[in-house]
A protein has these predicted regions:
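Transmembrane alpha-helical segments of polytopic membrane transport and secretion proteins
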Residues: 1-67, 294-295, 321-335
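A structural signal for multi-pass alpha-helical bundles of membrane permease subunits
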Residues: 60-335
Length: 335
């Protein structure tokens, strides 16, 4: 390519990149259509097998009943929390678990939760948000960059990295908690926020998910065209690849957020100061206090605090379900 041609390509970079972005969005829409077509084909295959066949109502009814039972099983804890969070402590101990009390005390319970023990619940909530924003956010960012690099670049040792990631996924996190505690104790980082944040930054499953999604969602032709037009790797990633990776990013973020938000064993062994507890450990402390002989009866506060704890996750999944469902399906669809 001559210098004049290269210069012209450089001058047209912005326009060309906009065209590439438009093509990328068009490719993403086409990919979504292919996913929908494959899902429709799968439903037709299931119908022929009898699972959703109107001519075979027995199997269809059985499947519906099984799904309904599973849905009730999943929703029962949430319904139990919702009902009992409306009770006073007296009603909680004197009424049936799935029956409402004489007094609707939900808002009083919420106010008491945030004022009990000098408002320690609010501190636990802020701690949890800190661990999620920094830990889960950092894990998502590293998974995006690492997964994209592994999917789109070829380098020596790539297969070995893949084997390490698969091996890391197969190791339960609880098996690493004690070695992590010993390491952090030697470094003097126990009972500090870093004891929660640093282990949360590594998500083998998130890295694997972004790797697979990057392979499926970002056509290599778009990257090659952007490079020919003079775009840097960073600009190619930021303006072309990143919009296509949005469903995978949301899916990875949700997995890491839920894992960090619900983390129990790691803070249990890492943290001693209640001022650094996340919600999981703090609520468990209240539960132990309520169930100990001679302890203060605060079961209604434990129930209300648990309800407050799960509401953000429920809202996040409901608002982002379009993205994470697409992200999970992408790795299973052959382009």
């Amino acid at each position: 390519m001559s210098a004049a041609t290269t210069s012209a390509a450089g001058r047209l970079t912005d326009g060309e990149l906009k065209a590439r972005e438009k093509a990328a969005r068009k490719a993403e829409k086409a990919r979504q259509k292919r996913i929908a077509a494959d899902e429709a084909a799968e439903r037709r295959r299931s119908a022929k097998a009898g699972f959703a066949n109107v001519n075979n109502p027995r199997r269809s009814t059985l499947l519906t009943v099984l799904c309904a039972v599973f849905a009730v099983y999943c929703l029962f804890p949430f319904v139990y929390l919702l009902i009992n969070a409306t009770k006073t402590q007296a009603d909680f101990t004197s009424t049936f678990g799935l029956g409402f009390g004489k007094t609707f005390a939900l808002f009083d319970n919420i106010a008491t939760v945030f004022s009990y023990q000098d408002g320690i619940f609010g501190r636990w909530l802020l701690n949890t948000l800190l661990y999620v924003v920094v830990g889960a956010g950092g894990a998502t960012l590293l998974a995006i960059m690492g997964g994209y690099a592994l999917a789109k670049f070829r380098f020596p040792g790539r297969n070995a990295v893949f084997a390490v990631i698969i091996g890391a996924i197969s190791v339960p996190g609880i098996a690493l908690a004690v070695p992590q505690f010993l390491l952090f104790a030697k470094l003097g980082l126990t009972n500090t926020p870093w004891a929660m944040i640093i282990p949360s930054l590594i998500s083998p499953f998130g890295l694997y998910l972004m790797w697979i999604f990057s392979e499926q969602a970002v056509p290599q032709e778009l990257l090659e065209a952007a490079r020919v037009d003079g775009a840097s790797e960073f600009r190619t990633f930021w303006q072309i690849s990143l919009p296509l990776l949005a469903p995978g990013i949301v899916t990875t973020a949700l997995f890491t957020i839920v894992a960090t938000w619900n983390n129990y064993f790691l803070p249990l062994i890492m943290l001693k100061d209640a001022d650094w507890y996340p919600l999981t450990i703090g609520l468990n402390q209240w539960k132990d206090q309520a169930s100990t002989a001679g302890g203060q009866a605060i079961q209604n506060l434990v129930i209300t605090g648990s309800l407050i704890t799960i509401i953000p996750l429920v809202i996040a999944f409901l608002c982002l379900q379009k993205y994470w469902q697409s992200g999970l399906a992408a790795g299973a669809v052959k382009e």
